[in-house]
Amino acid sequence: MIQRIILLLALSFSLAAAAQPEEVKKMHENAKAFMRTGDFDNAIIVLTRAVQKDSKNLELQKDLVMSYYFKRDYAKALEGAKELIDRDDADVVCFQIAGNVYKALEEVKDCDKMYKKALKKFPKSGPLYSEYGELLWAAKDMQAIRQWEEGIKNDPGYSGNYYNAALYYFYTKDKVWSLIYGEIFVNMESLSERGASMKGMLLQGYKEKLFADADIMKGEEKNKSEFAKAFLQGIGKQSTLTNNGISTETLTMIRTRFILDWYENNALKFPYKLFDFQRQLLQEGMFNAYNQWLFGASENLAAYDNWTKAHAEEYEAFSKFQKSRIFKMPAGQYYQN
């Protein structure tokens, strides 16, 4: 989360730099250099003087608070964070910074109030929903999932809420959303460490949750989501393929037949980007490689390495395709209700 804020600060700094007086701009650049090397004392010295020259500069104030935060001077950081979020021009990053400071001080109640204020101002901010949910989850408040679901609904292009929601559902009796959200996240963060760990949880979810009972609809009588029921019914039609156990190969067959059935019976009622993507891979002859990438290494790393060598051309084609596009969920495809 801190790395994401640093990236956002860097981007916002580049946009604001042109509007700064030349002297202040130079001071800000020097301060950023100190921050990058971990010399937060010097960063604070320079930023404090720069703020005196340009007291309305939001980017300077954000970096000053972050420098206090990284120095672990949380009292000063909190003082600055409160000033940041009280500004009329406070942006999402201001509230993210404040959230970090409150969490460091373990001031849960004040942090809770701050996130509520933030989401009232930015009701479409995925990062704020994600981080508010993380605060609640750390406090063992099961209402955390409501924040992550709201984040998915209001900002479907942000990956963090899919990650948190998938982890939450993996630890419940849910059979659907842990797999759906987990696979969406893996495609949004295909190269991250979190993405790699999520792939292992997906394979485990198919084995231990989805196909744990011979009757895949068992326990789903009270499921209010028509989308979830349609998903389970579609998967259930292929359950005989699990008679010899679950493997990457059997999952590929199950998921192939599921996609064909989905587009015959449910796609018009429930358009869904993840399934569109799977269908595209199927049509272009890359679905087998995709499933190997998704499940193979978690099932058996040596076997997966052998597969990539034996199917080098197929694997290379998928890898190039994967690196050439960015996967994002669009608005209007939220089916939890």
Summary of predicted features, one role per range:
Residues 36-37, 70-71, 104-105, 137-139, ...:
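Register position in tetratricopeptide repeats
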Residues 55, 89, 123, 156, ...:
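Short coil turns that delineate tetratricopeptide repeat
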Residues 60, 94, 128, 161, ...:
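TPR alpha-solenoid repeat register
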